[in-house]
Amino acid sequence: MALYREGKAAMAADGTVTGTGTKWQSSLSLIRPGATIMFLSSPIQMAVVNKVVSDTEIKAITTNGAVVASTDYAILLSDSLTVDGLAQDVAETLRYYQSQETVIADAVEFFKEFDFESLQNLANQIKADSEASESSAAAAAASESKAKTSEDNAKSSENAAKNSEVAAETTRDQIQQIIDNAGDQSTLVVLAQPDGFDSIGRVSSFAALRNLKPKKSGQHVLLTSYYDGWAAENKMPTGGGEFISSIGTATDDGGYIAAGPGYYWTRVVNNNSFTAEDFGCKTTATPPPNFNVLPAELFDNTAMMQAAFNLAISKSFKLNLSTGTYYFESSDTLRITGPIHIEGRPGTVFYHNPSNKANPKTDAFMNISGCSMGRISSINCFSNSYLGKGINFDRSVGDNRKLVLEHVYVDTFRWGFYVGEPECINQIEFHSCRAQSNYFQGIFIESFKEGQQYGHSAPVHFFNTICNGNGPTSFALGATYKTTKNEYIKVMDSVNDVGCQAYFQGLSNVQYIGGQLSGHGSPRNTSLATITQCNSFIIYGTDLEDINGFTTDGTAITTDNIDTIESNYLKDISGAAIVVSSCLGFKIDSPHIFKINTLSTIKLMNNTYNYEIGGFTPDEALKYNVWDANGLATNRISGVIHPRLVNSQLGINSVAFDNMSNKLDVSSLIHNETSQIIGLIPSTGSNVPHTRIMWSNGAMYSSTDLNNGFRLNYLSNHNEPLTPMHLYNEFSVSEFGGSVTESNALDEIKYIFIQTTYANSGDGRFIIQALDASGSVLSSNWYSPQSFNSTFPISGFVRFDVPTGAKKIRYGFVNSANYTGSLRSHFMSGFAYNKRFFLKIYAVYNDLGRYGQFEPPYSVAIDRFRVGDNTTQMPSIPASSATDVAGVNEVINSLLASLKANGFMSS
């Protein structure tokens, strides 16, 4: 309906509309805020009237910054098309005419008292005077004419006044007839009553609605906005809508029900959908916040958002969230206790800044319990100081329906997505979600019952979900965090997990499809993902990126802050990209690998079986093993391995087995074409060909097993004159040693290579001696990490030349400068060119050292010595000999004599 189109109008970019030939404030123009002004330009531009300033100026909003030159226009009043809008227009018209009745009546009374007889007498006197004197005839005639004109004008004015009075009375009678014909309950009748606005019509705020008493049930009222003052703030009204009255009592929930004494109003919900603003929630346009600077307009939405959640659950309504930032200052948790559908927008942000940081270890920002089905989409959750859990899943209902999280982003909590109770998983799907920059794990999902060996949860599926940049900071294991105890350390038999990106325990039918597991920007973690006691776990097409391995010195973890972990467990702190422990059914295929700098890309351990590994696509050379099987029992080996690493740049090993059970039938373990293994090439610049397969302690039982499994197919058939075999082993304090099952006379071995993974100061020395059959020393040397030179470009290697006639090799790692700290980060290993040759890795602690010797053809004799309770240090190499290589034999012999004399070594 066009209300006004006189003149022309132009609009500036700030929404100022200027009129030419307009009278926008005239009484019957009916222009008011909310009307639509349409400019008949090309293209047509539209805006909403916010304020009528004058006859020639209007302030408009929602203009999109458009600039319109002076043109024809039309002002529309959209709500005139409704009964209530039409009623308001008619009422204003009626009030106008009623306001004019007094003016019209005054005019009528004036002309009623006008002295027409005196006017006539005056005319007659003028005529008589004219006849008496001809000289004044012309003047008299003129006077008579003027008098006659005045008489006629007066008569016309009287008639006009009469007509106006009749017209006003007729209009009033017609409008009254319309009102009378509409019936007693019409909007017009109610508006015409003195208390009409109080009974029905439009109310400005939810608070005012509570005080608006209806006359009976079933009355309607329009709520303009949840809060007053929206126009003054130059904002659009939010939270408004239609309400219906009821006589009785109900609980006021702050959005759906507005209750007063003996009555209440119920919101009309269209399409089973409502907004958080219907409950008084507010957003700001502030972008994702600076954690140290809070905006001045901070508004705590906790109670209102919880009420909105409750309505969505109880009525099965969809809750719509707006673009903008919702702030939450209360430490209370937002709780979802049933099926729910929440839909945000790409710019929807939840920012958690609790004033009372009660218990960050257990508190959650959002807790989902009893939610067997539903969908939560497009929410970005932030916290200001790594508080509690982002979204916590707690005791889901056990049926076959599922909960879907879609485009949900969790950032800067302690944990991102967290499930920490048994039997609370029920078909959860994560679609395009992200957990980033959380203090511990981005994804921590554990559905584990004591005594349950493998996962028993309902399916958990991840599709294109990103988990990156999470994990503890470099000081997270220090004394500052004594109160955290074991909250981020998980011990899995012989490996501990410190701050991985994602942790899964006790799950069934898990799929991680696409997406990313990455350590982007995070301090070093042990792994990207740790998977333990799961059943049927699949990783497919996922980016595995950017991890260096956690390198914190073992002294950072003490019994003061972690009182249930023995220090000797902390030995795998270089980690792996993916750690799989005690799983029944594991498959990883087609991952994209980039910047992986851990001991292993995939580490299988502790009775993991029914696994399949393959399809790797590395972007660059891997530093160490592609995958590593550690301690897999004989009856658990049923994997199929398809590396498909043709011409890929790998690290030291493509496949590594460590601590395998004896009598392993290795021929049934790897089902692969030879070409898929031997196409590997070493990293650029390396003079030493990389190992194809790495074995260690207990891996091979006899030469028959060795020949059947690998020797012919994988170590000797590549037409390379030198194919090294890398020997590697890890020790705990209580168990070390082993036997060599295949070796060759030392006079056939030309070189021994010694490697370290840590370049420390000269506090430690690796010593090595070559002895003849009588035990006489033929050659000896020692090496500090600083001695490792660039002779062989592989970082951390030195070469020891084996002299002719050598029958025994003695080696060890000893303290050389009364070092009282820990040397846990020292790892020593060795291999020999052309022949299979076994050495151990040694990690020397401040209270424990090892000294070993190798004597072909079939045994390794390992002796250990221990200095009790950290009170006595290992015998030190004299300072005068610390850099005197020529005196190494005397030093070693003196050291051996001291060790034997103190009972630390056998004879």
UniProtKB/Swiss-Prot annotation:
Keywords: Degradation of host capsule during virus entry, Degradation of host cell envelope components during virus entry, Host-virus interaction, Viral attachment to host adhesion receptor, Viral attachment to host cell, Viral tail fiber protein, Viral tail protein, Virion, Virus entry into host cell
KW Flavoprotein (keyword) present: no
Assembly information from the UniProt record: Homotrimer.
Free-text note regarding domains: The N-terminus contains an extended triple helical bundle. The central part is a beta-helical domain, which forms a negatively charged cavity at the interface between neighboring monomers. This cavity may contain the active site. The C-terminus is formed by 3 four-stranded beta-sandwich folds.
First-listed, main subcellular location of the protein, grouped into a coarse class: virion
Primary role: Functions as a receptor binding protein (RBP) and probably mediates the attachment to the host capsular exopolysaccharides. Displays a depolymerase activity that specifically degrades the K2-type polysaccharides of Klebsiella pneumoniae capsule, which allows the phage to reach the host cell membrane and bind the entry receptor.
Biased composition (Basic and acidic residues): 145-155
Subcellular location(s) of the protein: Virion
Ranges where the record places region Disordered: 137-169
Gene Ontology BP annotations: adhesion receptor-mediated virion attachment to host cell; symbiont entry into host cell via disruption of host cell envelope; symbiont entry into host cell via disruption of host cell glycocalyx
Record-stated family: In the N-terminal section; belongs to the Webervirus depolymerase family.
Upper taxonomic lineage: Viruses, Duplodnaviria, Heunggongvirae, Uroviricota, Caudoviricetes
Top-rank lineage group of the source organism: Viruses
Bridged cysteine pairs (disulfide): none
Protein name: Depolymerase, capsule K2-specific
GO cellular component, one term: virus tail, fiber
